[in-house]
């Protein structure tokens, strides 16, 4: 990314390298062309291991990669912002859940993605759903409804 103003470029670099969000920029073929340090730490990769690679490297499966392309990537390429929860995989193949938001990069055939790790939230939600399901077996439908419908 080239800026005419050196101060703006310096400020952008500081934000890019120090933000609490993971950031990746991909080209029209979904190749990773830039990632920030937070993104690398979240996934356990070194920058050099990601740059130039296809984004498929961070998806949990071929199907997930294709589905993400249809549900998210193509929308962003058509100038529609995207914000969703999606599972990815770390270098060690451990699943990680991201809240991912994407926007097209102005005047380029690239997409800027920002990610936040929501893995613990997803795990907690799943536990609550399992417990609620178990609890529903022991309570009458009326009592269960009064508890969980507010």
Residue ranges of each PLM-predicted region?
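PAS-associated C-terminal cap
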Residues: 1-11, 116-126
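Sensory modules in modular signal-transduction proteins
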Residues: 6-25
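PAS/PAS-like sensory domains across diverse signaling proteins
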Residues: 29-31, 41
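Conserved hydrophobic beta-strand signature of PAS-family and PAS-like sensory domains
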Residues: 32-33, 95
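PAS-family sensory/regulatory domains
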Residues: 37, 49-63
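Terminal output helix/cap of sensory domains in signal transduction proteins
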Residues: 62-94, 101
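Short loop/turn elements at sensory-signaling interfaces that couple input to output
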Residues: 99-114
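Regulatory cytosolic signal-relay segments
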Residues: 118-150
């Amino acid at each position: 990314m080239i800026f005419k103003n050196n101060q703006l470029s310096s400020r952008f670099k500081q934000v890019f390298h120090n933000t609490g969000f993971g950031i990746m920029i991909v080209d029209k073929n979904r190749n990773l062309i830039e990632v920030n340090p937070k993104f690398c730490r979240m996934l356990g990769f070194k920058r050099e291991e990601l740059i130039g690679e296809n984004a498929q490297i961070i998806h949990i499966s071929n199907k997930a990669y294709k589905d993400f392309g249809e549900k998210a990537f193509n929308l962003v390429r058509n100038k529609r912002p995207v914000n969703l929860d999606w599972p990815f995989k770390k270098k060690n193949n451990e699943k990680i859940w991201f809240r991912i938001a994407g926007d097209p990069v102005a005047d380029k055939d690239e997409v800027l993605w920002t990610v936040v790790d929501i893995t613990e939230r997803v795990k907690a939600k799943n536990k609550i759903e399992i417990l609620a399901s178990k609890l529903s077996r022991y309570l009458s439908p009326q009592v269960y409804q009064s508890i969980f419908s507010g």
